[in-house]
């Protein structure tokens, strides 16, 4: 029943555009389990008064504009829900609507290219009154996106029990509000906080704490609207998460869904065929912030003869980066007996590396992970070309300088790759026999010699 939604297979609580609605608003609902129309039974539930926090949400979204951490699609989608309550009726039915004497006050907005007119109301109460009147007069309508009370509970038997209050008992929390505070529960469980522990607060309340939530674009309503309103209303000092919506990851050419005919692969199925590092670097380069992307694991789709695209990004590490690392260690052993040479990194290599570090930091702050891959790819391929050119020298001093320069690139690349492919990078650190300060961002511009004693 939502303007713009054409889905006939939506869940009972939301349309495919993410809008929440009441069961009474459904048009000819049919149960997916029984194939029969469901019975409407009066129930009592708890709701969060989300519309009461409209001003807070508007101020919050306004503060995000111009901040590169917040994607344009996120802001646009949230703004769609911050409109006044509206009803859409066909333009040819507008005269019938205006003849209903008891209709609450509304203003009409029309767009020439649209078949419907929008009836805009002052508040949700007036809109709901109008809905009842339209149904009474058998006038077809659709409701528009707006803030509505957010349901907290349900009457299914499984789930987390809602504490009894005001004589209401026997309810369980609805899955969506539970999922909003679940990351806090996970944090408490991971830290071993128990019920009364406070360690979790340093991750959710401390001034330097910041949670980032990477979500599907169809869940913006829950994490970008309901969660922010709920956390603010609790007034317990929770830091608002940064919401990072992404487009759909298609399985092959199809949008997979646990409720659809095409099911997404389970994590264990993927891990039986690929390493976590292969998957992580592949997803990093997927450009999901810009468009829906096809995920085509050859091992699961059984594509005979085709190149496995999941391995493409990993080849940057296993081939290009690994080639540079092996060249450095083998040459160090051959020409310097495994002792790191004294000297400083040449200015062009140091300047280029510093530039890459700063660009990496900028891209990370904007979640531009695909651009990150391009940056590191070019950095390492240029280093390999430089190695091929300079390694031909027979001058021992030039070879020592080559090692200092290339080990600096290895040191920088290992630190930048560490969040993405930690296992391989940890192996490099162990071969270098240096401590974990290598990963500390406050030392990111330091040369390799900084982490070593003399004659290392």
Cite the ranges covered by each PLM segment.
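Basic, alpha-helical terminal appendages of large translation-related enzymes
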Residues: 1-19, 23-24, 29-34, 97-103, ...
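Structured secondary-structure scaffolds
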Residues: 4, 30-334, 372-376
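Short acidic alpha-helix initiation/capping motifs at coil-to-helix transition points
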Residues: 52, 258-263, 351-353, 405-409
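Acidic/His metal-coordination segments adjacent to aromatic residues that form catalytic metal sites
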Residues: 257-264, 302-307, 354-367, 392
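Non-catalytic interaction-recognition regions
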Residues: 284, 343-350, 355, 362
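Non-transmembrane, amphipathic alpha-helical segments
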Residues: 309-316, 345, 361-371, 398-402
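Amphipathic alpha-helices that form helix-helix packing interfaces
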Residues: 321-324, 328-331, 352-356, 360, ...
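Secondary-structure edge/capping motif, primarily at the C-terminal ends of alpha-helices
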Residues: 332-335, 339, 360-367, 383-394
